[in-house]
Amino acid sequence: MNKDFFSKERFKYIIILALFNYIFLGTEYLFDNIVGDIKPQSVVTAQSYILGASVLGFLFFAIIKKYINKKLKYGLLSAFIVVETLLFALMEYSESYGFVVITGCVMFALFGVMGSAVYYISSVYLKSNRNVASTIGLAYGLGI
């Protein structure tokens, strides 16, 4: 590995990607546990719903990026964090399978938007770099 690989800028993107992966995967695991406590036979189905919602959020980022100005984008991402936190708290204390799945879908759709933003920003930085796979692999490993 060359000294370019260990640059301060690359390290910043590795940390950003790792944090996102850690938060996303940890929340997904916790969601599965919450659903498992309420309705164990439906964990896999509920997980497929939230992962589908995160894909929709991932795709929705393109619309946000294209049609919303820069200041509003930062405001939206900040609002998403607050909403996700509130939804998570509501979901944690709910005993209704339907409510948990609906709040989980909304929360993971917002995660999808945020994940798309994180990966987009990282890919813009890494576009002309030869070590993209190593960077993303390292970030994913750190996130787990």
Task: Locate predicted features.
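Glycine-rich segments within core transmembrane alpha-helices of 12-TM secondary carriers
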Residues: 127-144
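Intracellular juxtamembrane helix-capping segments at the cytosolic ends
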Residues: 112-127
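C-terminal ends and interior cores of transmembrane alpha-helices
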Residues: 79-96
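Pair of pore-lining "gating" transmembrane helices in MFS-fold secondary transporters
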Residues: 2-47
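Cytoplasmic membrane-interface "Motif A"-like loop-to-helix N-cap segments
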Residues: 66-80
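Central cavity-lining transmembrane alpha-helices of secondary-active solute carriers
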Residues: 44-66
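Hydrophobic core of transmembrane alpha-helices in multi-pass small-molecule transporters
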Residues: 97-116
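Juxtamembrane helix-start elements in MFS-like secondary transporters
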Residues: 38-51, 100, 132, 136
